[in-house]
Amino acid sequence: DALGITLVQGGFLLSMVQMAGMLVGVFAGLTADGIGLRRSVIAGQCIFALASLGGIWVGQAEHLLLLRAFEGLGFLLAVLPVPSLIRQLVSPERLALHLGFWGTYMATGTAIALFGGPLLMGLTGWQGLWGLLAVVSALMALWVWLQVPSERQRLGALAAATNPVPTESALARLRLTLTSAGPWRIAIVFSMYSSQWLAVIGFLPSVYAQAGLSSQTAGALTALASLVNVTGSIAAGRLLHRGVCSRHLLYLGFISMTLTAFLAFGPLTADAPVLRYLAVLLFSAIGGVIPGTLFSLAVHVAPNARTVSTTVGWMQQCSSAGQFLGPPLVAWVAGLAGGWQWTWTMTGAASLVGLLIASGVTLRRPDPMP
């Protein structure tokens, strides 16, 4: 409100951090594979810190949009290497569990921001919130540098010197990734999930504010809806660990999101706000099995171990495209309809595409690192 942002502009602001991912996600994955996983995470956190510092002095919506795009680059460098890094640090029998936990990062971060953001802005203003984010990002970069072993430490100095890992050119890794069916399928499936999840969760404060709820109440309800997504992702990791078929988990997630979105926004529940909110909670919670499943699949459908970050980068690129386009599209439909009652049609269409693509997902394990 302080910057005079319209609803559609708010949709783009919500998704602008995904601009970098939509344009260069796979290339950021190539960069992470090339410069080293740990270095990439540290660089991403440093970019977060710089972008947050810049946000303190933003005075126009256009400048904030540009800053969010720059922040998106840091997001890519920070998150794309993590599945591959987890694969190197965790024993194979516990890999699915840990990747399920990693799949909660977006929902957890969103919930923390929604719970703590309004409180901090009330105390320090939005400039103070940006400053705090800069400090947190800088501290996280320092923690990774101090606590996560480097590639040389993980491989062993002697082994790295006497038996160096063969390298492939970035172009070769890119070609290998984009000519394989597996990375394409999980990338499209992820985009169908992320587009509707961010659109629904991101606009819940506006939906509830229009219904007459206070900003604090709307923020708390939205934060809880975001946080329950964590349960689905963790459950996916545990179920995969026990041998449940990944394809069946994807089916469960998309079918549940379709049904619950209809209950949350359709005309049949217009006079049942409690039922609508319970449907939103189920939309997010059961839908959470999708990212938990996909992050686990990414390390298996990658053509080889040296293309895991590139595969995750391509998955993130398609996901970012969905997150960039989903919120503005839902806002546009809401503007035409004069309300949110047709939101379920957009989420239902995304789920249908996700189901069709997920039906062809097959599991293969990447070649081991030499």
Q: Could you tell me what each predicted segment is?
A:
Residues L67-T108:
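Cytoplasmic helix-loop-helix junction between adjacent transmembrane helices
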Residues Q18-V26, T110-A111, S226-V230, I234, ...:
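Residue-level signature of mid-helix packing/kink "hotspots" within the transmembrane helices
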Residues A305-A337:
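A late C-terminal transmembrane helix in Major Facilitator Superfamily
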Residues L23-G59:
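Conserved MFS/SLC helix-loop-helix module at the cytosolic interface between two early adjacent transmembrane helices
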Residues S246-L294:
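C-terminal transmembrane helical hairpin of 12-TM major facilitator-type secondary transporters
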Residues G34-G44, H241-S256:
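Cytoplasmic membrane-interface "Motif A"-like loop-to-helix N-cap segments
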